[in-house]
């Protein structure tokens, strides 16, 4: 068996997909490495071990061998009834079918045991630090040189970035899932642009009059007094590519996948803290400024 491995300071990674096939069914989950089973990773063709293995074994199930029929005690051996019939089953077409009742089925049982597997290990990479394998749903991009020089399993340790479209989608979905409608709302929500406005409570309600019959020319005006208690201010807008005056999203990036995920989390946390910040107009300056809502 030919294997490839990656040695790190905290583990040893092993795979039997030596040709890097896209669709591949690994057999390593059925084997024992120095007496232990390998731990699965989120990549189905790679497994994690504590160290580079010295012995690989396959568990062989218990099996029954040497099936035969032996003549029961008390019955005489003859040409028609031999002492042993070497067969695992006597069917209707057998010459011994009529005397089958004179025999007991016998066999030997071999217990479960481990069979050593000959293997050849090719350590394709050695890493001084720890390798942290993390699952993700990103479509990662790398520079050409890293793609040429680095094994696919180790690409996640290299600098990476997301496309503008994917970065925009992450931001858009996160805002929609976490916005507090009491303090902000989305006014434009499209694949090509997103706008969020801040909802500010007025320091003093603004009185205004509306004509309920304004749309009916022949009716007398019916006036109603109303009060405006809130106003809206644009706080965030973004687009995946050039569109009108919208700022183009800056793609997420990181020195590796772990750093990328950390950068995405920090950006989204900071953004939502800004969007959901509870602000109201300041009474002291009569709405020229805003302050935190203490309620």
UniProtKB/Swiss-Prot annotation:
Counteracts the host Gabija antiviral defense system by suppressing the ability of Gabija to cleave DNA. The keyword Aminoacyl-tRNA synthetase does not apply. Coiled coil: none annotated. GO terms for biological process: symbiont-mediated suppression of host innate immune response. Signal peptide: none annotated. This is Gabija anti-defense 1. Disulfide bonds: none annotated. Keywords: Host-virus interaction, Inhibition of host innate immune response by virus, Viral immunoevasion. The gene is gad1. Binds the Gabija complex as an octamer and inhibits its ability to bind and cleave DNA. Disruption phenotype: Knockout of this gene prevents the phage to overcome the host Gabija defense. Belongs to the Caudoviricetes Gad1 anti-defense protein family.
